[in-house]
Amino acid sequence: MKTASCFGPAHILLPGENIPLEKWGCVACDQFTSDRAYWEQADAVVGGCPSTLRLILPEVYLEDEDAARRVENIHAAMDEYSRDVLTRAVDGFVYVERTEQSGRVRQGLVGKIDLEAYSYEKGARPAIRPSERTVTERIPPRMAVRRGAALETPHVMMLADDPGCTLVEPIGAHKSELKKLYEGELMQGGGHIAGWAVEDPAMLAQIDAAQAALGSQEAFDARYPQARGAKPLTLAVGDGNHSLAAAKACWEELKATLTPEERESHPARWCLAEVCNVHSPAIEIEPIHRVLFNVDCGAVLLALIAWSDSNMAGICFGDSKQQAFTLAGPHVSNVLSFEDPVAPLTVGTVDEFIEYFMARHSEARVDYVHDEPAVRALTRQGGVAFLLPPFEKSDLFKGIVMGGVLPRKTFSMGHAEEKRYYIECRRIKE
């Protein structure tokens, strides 16, 4: 299964058919980060059944005193599942169809990406790039789980700029020829999912050729004429940016201890991920809103006005068609607009203010929530929210190519329940 491409086939592990899918799969660890009740309910749903919930550390628990013990339990579960639970394997890709709440079907290919073809360093131009700024302080807690882990299970979703639908969609057109691996409902409103094994050599070659064409200099120059001659971009990280960065950091750490020959084949060099086509109608790019906690809405508004007056032309009430957003608190909600803003995107200007505000209010805490009803619920509990305008997905790749990265947590793909659920696993320890 050797390939020179940055995304290739893998030895993918799955649980035995006796394990219920609705208990095995759980949502990405970086969802519901302010909602412990969600994760407590997930724990109740799983009970004593094997589940990927036991292989991850939900971020809601990252700062708890027992986080280290949780990591130990995760590693122990990985060893147990390697022996007794993950009894099926695919040598290739898994073609996935996820039916979203809207009824649209999101198609994807699960395979491994080469971490040598990826970097989150500022200014780097590898074939695989983050879509948003990577906050290095967020990497170590994720490294603690991956370091020493026997297995990985992915919630990383990669995006291909494939307007001709050459990579993922042709596999879906022939799914009747493939062996179905799983199908069923996902827990807690996750919807329906099905997966098929892609192991046929001709199909593997087809995927490799399509990917090579997408990542060619000729295709890159045609798609982005303003960046003609620059290093081509093949895949961008859609979801799971910091988890992928942690995998890269762990690989660099391990690589330093390996011989050149060992570096060529060690399983930790790769990371399992799902690749989707950004042009799919089922891919929705939604803004991620900001919510401040332990603050007073009136104080935030006064500070915002003062900061805007000092750093730009000010702020006005109503939509001025420049950078409009909604500031919402427990009892108030106002549309505001930055005048002569300091950043190209509304999210960038809002982030600059939040950074300024939090530097002066040590009690303040910020969370990033992409579901507007969830944001409104948090404001009723005392949070102060910055609700951001829609983000056009057509600008995503152009923004990465021309600007390097977008501001941190600019966008999200779908609602929280529609995020990738952990199902497939891969061994990363020799």
Q: Which residues does each PLM region occupy?
A:
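Active-site beta-strand/loop microenvironment that shapes enzyme catalytic pockets
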Residues: A213-L258, R263
